């Protein structure tokens, strides 16, 4: 799950 919603890959 990376660029699906926001910067969820960074959270």
Swiss-Prot record:
Chain coiled-coil ranges: none
Residues annotated as signal peptide: none
Major localisation: plastid
Ribosomal protein is among the record's keywords: yes
Key words of the record: Plastid, Ribonucleoprotein, Ribosomal protein
Compartmental location: Plastid
GO cellular component, one term: plastid
Sequence similarity: Belongs to the universal ribosomal protein uS2 family.
Descriptive protein name: Small ribosomal subunit protein uS2c
Organism, scientific name: Conopholis americana
């Amino acid at each position: 799950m990376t660029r699906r919603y926001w910067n969820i890959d960074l959270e």
